[in-house]
A protein has these predicted regions:
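Hydrophobic/aromatic-rich core segments of domains that either
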Residues: 1-82
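Beta-strand-rich domain onsets/edges
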Residues: 79-106
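Short, acidic Ser/Thr/Gly-rich low-complexity loop/linker segments typical of extracellular
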Residues: 130-145, 227-229
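Structured interaction patches on ligand/partner-binding surfaces of diverse proteins
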Residues: 163-191, 252-253
Length: 253
């Protein structure tokens, strides 16, 4: 923000763009400069426009699912029936610029697995980020069909409704949407178990395998059957077609 204000103070048309990561924790912000009617991404600390845009578009875990621009002039034309749920995505100082940023986007359309609270409502596209599902986009649900505009594929999401209680109510199972828009839902088959051998990083905090239980709506630990060496863990009781999460059980303090 300091670099942005310093450049704007001398007349350089710079803005801040931001994303919530979908393949790792937390969020990220960078700058974009206006030149001949187009914005070019760059990082004041790391790289210039060409190099930085290329990095965001080609490094798998850095490719944003949604990109937003922080505005200096509030856009009060945004109007939608509010459900009372609080999220920064509703700010009039935020603009969705995913499509204009050059990423391959798609319009996501998916049917809810659980009955929504009303025939039409706002819905939230969420990514799992730092031990919780966090909204990354707002869409609309009509007759149990959820729609979101300009989403980057090859990401895992879940869809939820919000409310004045500030809690999310999940109305789909977690799912993967690929770059073509094909959807695979992760609904565990507890009657069909699969095995998996996982690598243990030396010197790192021990991690545990979990799967998302669509009925309980949280990640359930999977028991480790054996540690085959000082570098591997062996699991034999993993529900088939489950969304797996391999991580420490608690947030860092």
């Amino acid at each position: 923000n300091f670099a942005t204000m310093a450049m704007r103070a001398v007349g350089i048309p710079v803005v801040v763009q931001t994303t919530t990561w979908t393949k790792m924790d937390l969020a990220h912000s960078w700058c974009a400069v206006l030149q001949d009617g187009e914005f070019y991404d760059f990082s004041p600390a790391y790289a210039g426009p060409d190099e930085y845009r290329q990095k965001l578009m080609t490094v798998r875990y850095l490719k944003p699912a949604k990109v937003y621009r922080n505005l200096f002039d509030a856009d009060f034309k945004k109007s939608r029936t509010d459900d009372g749920y609080t999220t920064y995505l509703k700010s009039p100082l935020l603009k969705d610029v995913t499509a204009e940023s050059g990423y391959p986007v798609l319009d996501l359309r998916i049917e809810a697995d659980k009955e929504p609270s009303s025939a039409e409502s706002l819905v939230y596209l969420c990514a799992y980020n730092y031990y919780e599902w966090k909204p990354v986009a707002i869409g609309i649900q009509t007759d149990a069909v959820c729609e979101f505009k300009d989403v980057v594929g090859n990401n895992i999401f879940i869809i939820a409704e919000g409310g004045k209680e500030q809690e999310l109510r999940y109305i789909t199972a977690p799912f993967l949407v690929d770059s073509s828009g094909h959807i695979r839902k992760f609904i565990p088959d507890k009657n069909k178990l699969v095995t998996q051998e996982l690598w243990i990083e030396k010197g790192k905090t021990p991690r545990n395998l979990h799967f998302w239980d669509v009925e309980k709506e949280y990640f359930i630990p999977v028991s480790c059957d054996s540690i085959t060496s000082d570098t591997t863990q062996f699991y034999t009781r993993i529900p088939d077609n489950a969304l797996l999460w391999y991580a420490t059980s608690h947030r860092a303090l």
